[in-house]
Amino acid sequence: MELTPGAQQQGINYQELTSGWQDVKSMMLVPEPTRKFPSGPLLTSVRFSNLSPESQQQDVKSLEFTVEPKLQSVKHVKLSSVSLQQTIKSVELAPGSLPQRVKYGEQTPRTNYQIMESSELIPRPGHQFAKYAEMIPQPKYQIPKSANLISIPIYHATESSEMAQGLAYKGIDTVEKSVGLTPKLTGRAKESLGMLLQPDLQVPKFVDLTPMVRDQGSKFLGLTPEKSYQILETMELLSQSRPRVKDVGELYMKPLQQTVEYEGITPELKHYFTEAMGLTAEARIQANEFFGMTPKPTSQATGFAERSPRLCPQNLECVEVISEKRLQGEESVVLIPKSLHHVPDSASGMTPGLGHRVPESVELTSKSGVQVEKTLQLTPKPQHHVGSPGIISGLGHQVPESVNLTCKQWLQMEESLEVPLKQTSQVIGHEESVELTSEARQHREVSMGLTKSKNQSMKSPGTTPGPLGRIVEFMRISPEPLDQVTESARTQLQVAQSEEVILIDVPKVVQSVKVTPGPPFQIVKSVTIPRPTPQMVEYIELTPKLQYVRPSEHHTGPCLQDVKSTKLITKPKHQILETVELTGFQIVKTMLIPGPSLQIVKSEELAPGPIPQVVEPIGVALESGIEAINCVDLLPRPHLQELIVPAELTPSPCTQVKSAELTSPQTSPFEEHTILTHKQGLQAVKSTVIKTEPPKVMETEDLNLGHVCQNRDCQKLTSEELQVGTDFSRFLQSSSTTLISSSVRTASELGGLWDSGIQEVSRALDIKNPGTDILQPEETYIDPTMIQSLTFPLALHNQSSDKTANIVENPCPEILGVDVISKETTKRKQMEELENSLQRHLPQSWRSRSRTFQAESGVQKGLIKSFPGRQHNVWESHAWRQRLPRKYLSTMLMLGNILGTTMERKLCSQTSLAERATADTCQSIQNLFGIPAELMEPSQSLPEKGPVTISQPSVVKNYIQRHTFYHGHKKRMALRIWTRGSTSSIIQQYSGTRVRIKKTNSTFNGISQEVIQHMPVSCAGGQLPVLVKSESSLSIFYDREDLVPMEESEDSQSDSQTRISESQHSLKPNYLSQAKTDFSEQFQLLEDLQLKIAAKLLRSQIPPDVPPPLASGLVLKYPICLQCGRCSGLNCHHKLQTTSGPYLLIYPQLHLVRTPEGHGEVRLHLGFRLRIGKRSQISKYRERDRPVIRRSPISPSQRKAKIYTQASKSPTSTIDLQSGPSQSPAPVQVYIRRGQRSRPDLVEKTKTRAPGHYEFTQVHNLPESDSESTQNEKRAKVRTKKTSDSKYPMKRITKRLRKHRKFYTNSRTTIESPSRELAAHLRRKRIGATQTSTASLKRQPKKPSQPKFMQLLFQSLKRAFQTAHRVIASVGRKPVDGTRPDNLWASKNYYPKQNARDYCLPSSIKRDKRSADKLTPAGSTIKQEDILWGGTVQCRSAQQPRRAYSFQPRPLRLPKPTDSQSGIAFQTASVGQPLRTVQKDSSSRSKKNFYRNETSSQESKNLSTPGTRVQARGRILPGSPVKRTWHRHLKDKLTHKEHNHPSFYRERTPRGPSERTRHNPSWRNHRSPSERSQRSSLERRHHSPSQRSHCSPSRKNHSSPSERSWRSPSQRNHCSPPERSCHSLSERGLHSPSQRSHRGPSQRRHHSPSERSHRSPSERSHRSSSERRHRSPSQRSHRGPSERSHCSPSERRHRSPSQRSHRGPSERRHHSPSKRSHRSPARRSHRSPSERSHHSPSERSHHSPSERRHHSPSERSHCSPSERSHCSPSERRHRSPSERRHHSPSEKSHHSPSERSHHSPSERRRHSPLERSRHSLLERSHRSPSERRSHRSFERSHRRISERSHSPSEKSHLSPLERSRCSPSERRGHSSSGKTCHSPSERSHRSPSGMRQGRTSERSHRSSCERTRHSPSEMRPGRPSGRNHCSPSERSRRSPLKEGLKYSFPGERPSHSLSRDFKNQTTLLGTTHKNPKAGQVWRPEATR
């Protein structure tokens, strides 16, 4: 009994969870599902087990989606059991599992009777589907389960008929499997349409599902107590409910009776699981739903679910089950329920109606609604699609009726309260409506119960919401898996599952609808439903893809909606999905089964899509990690292969669907999947999988390839089967799509691709299906993903696949080592071997995608990082730890050479290939060296020197190669820069080793002469001159420096001299010879080097801050010109002031980091120390002690905090990456290891040292340390000299200038400016690396955006550096460049001047701040960096809040850097609209300094979400997690940017320019007081939730719990004197190094100019002196009373004494809850302070606690799941509306309906689950489940309504509208709708909050605005209850605020939401205080 094993895996998992379920499952499933399907579920289970961490995400996703529906059920059942088991095991997904299991109960019942069906259907899904049913069964289940739903109904009918019939149904199942099911289904569906069988089936399914739900519930109860008594109760309730349903639903009486009947059948499950739980939820939901008791069931369900995490999920599940039941029960009305589901979704616009069903409704609307809408909109399609237009007509009528009814009902219901209208709906078509109402109620239930998902769905658009709901659920599941995964996973999984169930039901319905024609319709509808499931899947993809999808599948999230609007623009556009696919495949869909197949492909793409998005997370993730799936499935390889075939087919379908929908969505699926997989699948799958199976990957690849070949055969057979039945369409959904295009080709491609790419299957499938249809575009995306994956993930995974297939012997090394080219070759081989059709597309698309993916480099990198992170788990465990090549020098040099060669080869190979290879190489280098992709790309974007350098063979080839090789390719340059060109040269130069300057001279002829003149410098210069050639040479220089230091630290870490020679000599040959093995070898070498260096350092016991002795060979001396920051002697024409210096010491640093697993890790970073002389060294040594000492205080708590941040942020994400990958994160993980691990160290260290350091350090693992070391060096010197290191360049320069230390000023200024630039650059790099790491984790979905972002970022950096160079030259050469400083000062007016002001103002303070600087050096460095960078991205964002003050002069001097950087596309994109906000902020700045500060803060935070992340980094100072989070956020946001790209990057990027701009006086002013605080708040929020959420579910969750935990304790501790000092430090660090130190120096400084201006002069000066002083002492201790009072307005926003002391008392108090959302509270506090400023101190206090907590749950939770997820969908959507509205209409619309709705509920829900469990447990208790649902529903619907109603406004003012949302109009909308929306929860919250009752409008206002304006009253009431009720009230508040802050937190939209909300809050504060002006003025500001 494979299935029994599968079920037993599942069942074992289930057994673990519930043996009964397994028994039930076994009993039910044992017959046949046990055999064949089990493997599928087993494999799925295993797969999702591997994905388990993400399984919760992806499980939820998987669960929600394809797996969710059926295979998802199976997968989810299995995955749920596995995932849930693993999740339960791992995350206590027992709740999550239960949700998943509940889902999986649903689905497991479904899966069970999916498996039962699979038992019965197993022949069909099981046999044909076995693989397909495993994978596709879930789609097939979804489809079969739609078919299987029909089958399930049949099966239920069969089961109702008997399990025997079900078992007979097995045989029938086989028949129905292909089509028999559909006939049966049709018969039964028609019978079911008669509603007996379908309700019967539905009920049995429901019962089954309920038992599963119960089992899951029981398991979840595990957690069985509730479930047990609930089961008994539920059994009673089932009996009751059935009678009720009988009473209530005449039809349902039948279903209920039949359910009772079935209960007799299902009693196993029912009683077993006491299906009563699910049935109780069901029965209750049915009864309640039928009785309109939805609140009750919801409450029960919620109570249960929250008790109940599963009851709510079970309720959701029950709702889902009811949905299923109803869908099944209403399968007569199946389409009506579906229509209700779908049509409400459709009618709801899928948004209002089916917020929850909107996913289903969107998805189901896509299916039902789409089928209904398809029936209605695509009515032909759904109808003909349904294949039974009669049924569709009947159902279609019902569906249209339902659509009308349901849409109306749903919209009405959901809009009203769903209950009334649902009851109305119920009333409307009593039987039909009862079923519809049951569905309406179910939807109301789902809307109420699933209001979370529905609200999420509604919140999303209902289209996205469904998926978003799911994704939100899924996102919530991401949090849910962690904390409220149980509830959220359950609730959301069950909601998602409910959606999936609805989806499944929709398939059931659809299958019911698509009776016999329905088989295609089953398929199609299944496809449709799987599509919705894919919507969910794509929403799952959206969740992973959310981030990635935000750019790509933003179209799939919103753009999945968009893409599915492309496909089916939203899954409501599942029509369009089917229309796009149907368009592409509507024709295809018109192409009957191909159409349905395509729909199945779409569905299965999406249904498997979900699975492949879960499976594609496994499948596309398996693309990059079909190995992951394979690996996951490697556990159950057959299943995997079966599932992988579906998974890969599914990934392909997903990709295809997405590709079909959108090549971007295709990319989305990939990147979604890859990112999802990376994020979830890769982290989960890859981590699990690759951890588990680099070898297994080989095996699995072999097996999978074999199986895939089998599957290929199966797929080929399946194409026949598809012809035979929808099985192929389902099974080969991707094939189906391609099959639609060409079944044979698809089959062959699919089959072929299976081999080449189970990895590429997802890609190839993605490529294939779209390859036919969208093959090339898709492949373009797939290829980049493949390239990405190939580069490292695919290098690891695809090479595991490819190379495992081809090179099984060298999976890890080959995976790593395989070139993209080799990968491409291998894949091509495999593709050729497998199917040349795909290959045709792949190589081209591969290259095309290479380009695409270069844009998606971030995705690639994130993928790679995540993937390599996962692989590194395996890899590091094996290769890094075990395989420690002894030839470190030669290997490292070889590594560098190989990197260069590989890069060169790739670059030289083709332009596309070269670019792709470059991207791959860059990524490889980045991953290897932990070099942030952003740095690589900007380096790449700095190709000016590239052409010159390329010719140089040795140095260039060695390391300069990287930059030299980038002739026109900026990337090449960056790579060379990063690779050891500089290092070798520098090392040689300094080591006296033969300088390869002549080659460099050849490269740099003119320069090389100079270089020759300055031989030692020339070497470094040779590298630098490449960089320095252009003004961007500084950037490159720093890039190179970072790269060099990084590599140098590796290089140096080994024997730098020896290695240099080796490097130069061996790298040349090796460089070319070992291009392919190089990556793996380089990885290994890097690891070995790191290990060796670590060993050296450990033996030496050298403090991490202290450079090793120069004689150790580990230190690279990089001569740096302090005047220009360039490598001395090369590009620098300045006379060397000293023969010996100044120079950067690039040295390896060891940081002991506590991994999320609690293990201690030694992480190797590059330290950078600027040595100007022995004096500096003295300082350096001082600093060594200082940072170490600082490390000691901060390190333990914040190390833990950081680790926990990492752990909490990426336990799931980073658990894969960091827990598993923590040890072996692959390049990214190596990077993350170095970066994240290093980050904790560095963060600790940096925390200890300075936020800037950790920021700096976190950016780069090695360069981080390097930068950190440099900065530490600088800092040590500066601290010795000036305490401020970050500040020291400016401050110290100013000070020294004031001191008239001309040389020191010049050299120091120059050094420090360059150092700062370097530090900034390195920090940026690190930040980039951190972002890359973090973003890798978080941005995995967003990877595509990263390259652009990187480019923009680095252009910004380049310009900032150029400006910085100028400034440095001016400052450094101030005596020399008298005019230039004026010019620079004129351009960067305040760069030195303001620095002088800032630095000089607190000259004494600086001394005071030395201690503070110890705390704030990193922030100072960040400040420098920001100064240098113009607050580039992170500094811009994070530091500029504080720096906003200091940067306000600096804005003037940085306006040019800002502007120059703003001129950069990154900043342009970023600045474009955030800049508008900034400009508006600037415009309004005087009127609304606080307001705009707040706005700026918020908008800055919005825009500064990267900066926010930085601030979050600083804030989180576990900021390394924050940084990582920030990075992740960046990546996530970059991914979001890809999703939210215009906006996200604009928002995030605007942090570069706009934030710079805002950091310009406006931003800086805005941000400095308010925005900094708000940005602190927001960023903190954003970071804590967003970054957390972006970090990953687990990172988010762990960030939420762990980070919360550590933040709670450690930040409490930090809040306590340690946290105060560490809040000075750590909160600065937490706020952001820049906020920390900028709060110290920058806030000092920024407070000086901006905040000074904002703060009263006294506050300014006080803040300058007092804040600076207090920041050093008081800020550390309490920020000083005056600073507290001064910070009150401004820094309250920031964390000033009030915030610090607030944080101390309040925020510390809150820091346990709030500082958990430390960033949230801090942000909250900051926003609070800003809002406090705006609100009042008490409001600030209230804001502090309330809003902190408010933002804690809402933001963290919101940001956590929502920002991660919603940064994917919601942030995409949030940014979508916010940024998109800001930046694009799509974003706007998506944002407004989807994101708002979605974010609101989604984040509400998702955050609700997590934070609900944490924060919202109170909120939950306060906010009844139904109220939460209702709140969510209403918030969703009202936010949707609001957002929709405010959509124009919101669109017109994204910020304003989000303001609008948060601002009066939307507040009004929110007030009206928010009142309504928030009425329930706000009422309940108000009720709990007390004063909130009367604040309904205020809360609606405050809902939107309340977050914004957690006014003193609101927050005051919310303070007692607002803290706890801040969870509820905040939830209601946060519901809107979630909407706003959610949007604000999760992404830029969250930021914009925060911006809006805060602006609205500010506006509301302003609205309250200056409401019209604030609301409106802020709006323009935000809009501007």
Swiss-Prot record:
Residues 1636-1647, 1668-1679, 1692-1727 have a biased composition (Basic residues). Residues 1599-1610 have a biased composition (Low complexity). Residues 448-467, 1045-1067, 1181-1287, 1326-1346, 1439-1984 are annotated as: Disordered. Coiled coil: none annotated. Residues 1238-1247, 1532-1558, 1568-1579, 1620-1630, 1648-1667, 1680-1691, 1728-1869, 1895-1917, 1928-1941, 1949-1959 have a biased composition (Basic and acidic residues). This is Spermatogenesis-associated protein 31H1. Residues 450-463, 1058-1067, 1205-1226, 1458-1471, 1492-1508, 1960-1969 have a biased composition (Polar residues). Expressed in sperm (at protein level). The P-S-E-R-S-H-H-S repeats give rise to an antiparallel beta-structure. Sequence repeats lie at residues 1593-1600, 1601-1608, 1609-1616, 1641-1648, 1649-1656, 1657-1664, 1681-1688, 1689-1696, 1697-1704, 1705-1712, 1713-1720, 1721-1728, 1729-1736, 1737-1744, 1745-1752, 1753-1760, 1761-1768, 1769-1776, 1777-1784, 1785-1792, 1793-1800, 1801-1808, 1848-1855, 1864-1871, 1880-1887, 1921-1928, 1929-1935. Keywords: Repeat. GO terms for cellular component: extracellular exosome; nucleus. It comes from Homo sapiens. Residues 1593-1935 are annotated as: 27 X 8 AA approximate tandem repeat of P-S-E-R-S-H-H-S. The gene is SPATA31H1.
